[in-house]
Amino acid sequence: NDGWNFWDYSGVTVINIVVDHPLYYNQFLKALPEHYRQVNIDHMHIDYMKRFFPDVDVYFIPSAGTELNKHRKLIKDYDYLPMCQRPIDVIFTGNYTPKHILRKQLNNMEQDYIDFYESALERLIMSPDLTIDELSEMCLKQEFPEITDEQLANCMPPMMYVDLSVRFHYRQLVIRMLADSGIKLNTYGSGYNYIECNHPENIIMHGGVNSQKCLDMISQSKISLNVMPWFKNGIHDRIFNSCLNGAVSLSDSSIYIDELFTDRQNIIL
């Protein structure tokens, strides 16, 4: 609060790998260490930074995966399990948060603001090709035609509600479709008791686990499901983790994924 900065005092270069949309961190981007470098995992997040925070040094690096092996050690000494020895057919690693919990972010707002964010969410669900940036600018300029870029940037953080809600909306749709189709899906993460579907018995919940446990179970799975968290020109580490640990990666796509992979050859999209 007094302006003193440990990193500047120590002369340390700070490299921050941001794995969410930068709008989640707008408040911190206004008071950065002198020698600050930011890594983003989506090219569109780079565009956001260059537009709204042009003084910040930003770089694109895709989120990396981690390889285990047959004995589930981080040090590679054996190949991963062949398909015929993998006990899990389909796995999903990650959490699920239902809308009624996310909605608490809006509880202290006036009704006009609540209506605005709910309308924006509905619009994004109906137009899933839009990025959160495009949607936000579209909705805000509709309300405030003369809004400046500075004002637009200041209005972005509350759109976190829309970003999270649409992510979990589609996550639920995919998991519900699989479960109701009779496919047993092993989930490693919290919140799946909230999934609304006709056949919840097909969602085998293992609860919240750490990252190494997720890798361990992917290395024992035939198919690893990924639902992209609204990265339109990036990738999620679930895909690399799946590939590195011998599972078939089943995912929706993005511009960047289309550049890296070929459908039905090294990924199923």
Q: What does each of the following model-derived ranges do?
A:
Residues 3, 27, 212-213:
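Short acidic active-site motifs
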Residues 138-181:
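Alpha-helix-centered segments that form part of catalytic cores
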Residues 31-33, 47-56, 165, 190-269:
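Catalytic binding pocket for nucleotide-activated donors in carbohydrate/polymer assembly enzymes
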Residues 11-144:
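Catalytic core of nucleotide-activated saccharide and alditol-phosphate transferases
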